[in-house]
Amino acid sequence: MNLALSLLHKRGFLKQCTSLKVLSDLMDREKIVFYAGVDATSSSLHIGHLIPFLAMMHLRQHGHMPIVLIGDSTAKIGDPSGKSEMRKILSSEEIGNNALLIKNQLQRITKFTSECFIHNSNWLDNLNYIEFLRDVGMHFSVNRMLSFETYKRRMDFGLSFIEFNYQLLQSYDYYMLNKIKNCRLQIGGDDQWGNIISGVDLIRKKNGSETFGLTFPLITRSDGKKMGKSEKGAVYLDSNLFSIYDFYQYFRNTSDSDVKTFLYLFTFLEEDEIELISNFKGNSLNKAKEILAFEITKIVHGEAEALKVQEASFAAFRGSGDRSNIPFFKFSFSSLKEEILLVDLMLDSKIVPSKSEGRRLIDSGGVYINGKRVESQSHLLTKKDFNNNEVELRVGKKKFLRIVI
């Protein structure tokens, strides 16, 4: 197998591929242009979106030429893949802003030049509908489209005609990139398989060219939960939506059984180093988790920020050191009262999802103020508890929050 494809396979990226042997031979002979797309439906990507772009970085290291397609036109429709209901329709202004933010985010992470980023509005915004139906729609079988899991799943919930068009548009994207950039490979998550092979078929029918599609597994944790979700919501790559400290802690708290898998997927460490550190046992495995958290934080947020939150994490668990990057909650006492029920503050700061959960944690001995266990549900936090205008709240073993006045 081609070296680049073999690396993706070893690291757990490869799920399905059209004509793998033919693609491998092609990549042995020449460096190819390949692409992955992302719709501008949000102002930030989350960790679940990152896998295709990490794979792109591996392929780029082997000399292949990446294109990141920003779906500013397809964002007006929304991909039904993995969705049980129609996406919210966004304004042109929202989509334009999202497209810029996502481009900047991915450029910072991948270090790709601006020339690697293309918007599909370049060809989709000025399509003539009648000509599109005649020249593109004629190559699609409705029966075959309905056989794909994306559409089969939505038939029970309702599928709008606008969403039904999405596969044609993504296929046309691939056709246009093949036409203007000689793009030979599209990559994406496995939920994109139907859209990708439809693009491969369209190109073959339109101009006889052989192109390829490759998908990656949709990452789930060993507990069966979807990768990229936390108690605080989606693990966004934007630090304004999900703090860098929480991002680091998300990976630092990886379950033992996921450490090796995530080291291969979310870092660029060499195979022998991953094999060594992922085989640590007992408490030593925590070192492997720290390495995982640091490496992926470095990729997404830069080495300087990764070092800051690593030190903050060490400080939180040691009780000393630079704690400035531990998340904080700004709080003001009422002008009439200089105390607050701790359970209320825990809910206000969102360190617990409900008062009942806060009470349960206190009863089980899992809540600490400045290192001292809270014994009562009726515990009051007063100004006397604050040292240099802050106290440290710890919930369980791993959740730390500075309460600042």
UniProtKB/Swiss-Prot annotation:
Family statement drawn from the similarity comment of this UniProt entry: Belongs to the class-I aminoacyl-tRNA synthetase family. TyrS type 1 subfamily.
Organism ancestry: Bacteria, Pseudomonadati, Spirochaetota, Spirochaetia, Spirochaetales
GO cellular component: cytosol
Keyword Chaperone included in the entry's annotation: no
Function, as annotated: Catalyzes the attachment of tyrosine to tRNA(Tyr) in a two-step reaction: tyrosine is first activated by ATP to form Tyr-AMP and then transferred to the acceptor end of tRNA(Tyr).
Record text on subunit structure and interactions: Homodimer.
Protein's name in the database: Tyrosine--tRNA ligase
Chemical reaction(s) catalysed: tRNA(Tyr) + L-tyrosine + ATP = L-tyrosyl-tRNA(Tyr) + AMP + diphosphate + H(+)
Motif ('HIGH' region): 40-49
